[in-house]
């Protein structure tokens, strides 16, 4: 109910917010605070990983992007080793374990958003990722 002045005329206040048409904002999809923090964490780790660690992450990312392809799975199995089972995991191995857990909990649009954020900070790495995914085409 509008406020009324003493002369019984309704008072109207201009909107303080600009009128924005719906669905014209190219911003990324909304995601939970927790998911956004997980992504920030992984991107921070990535910035500090060595070349071989980044290559290992690339293999895992490709395997996640093309899960039905057998070749990435076989390539990942080659990375497994039973030697050193008595030692505790390295920090990098713990980071990969968390990455795997978090990634599995993300929706497809959140996964795509992660790749978009990674591409913003590491375009060369993401270009290698796209090349590796394309290379899996036809390999069953």
From Swiss-Prot:
The keyword Mitochondrion applies. It comes from the Eukaryota. The keyword RNA-binding does not apply. It is found in: Mitochondrion. Coiled coil: none annotated. It holds the Pfam family DUF4508. One of its GO terms (cellular component) is mitochondrion. Keywords: Mitochondrion. PANTHER family: PTHR16260:SF4, SIMILAR TO 1700123O20RIK PROTEIN. This is Uncharacterized protein C14orf119. The gene is C14orf119.
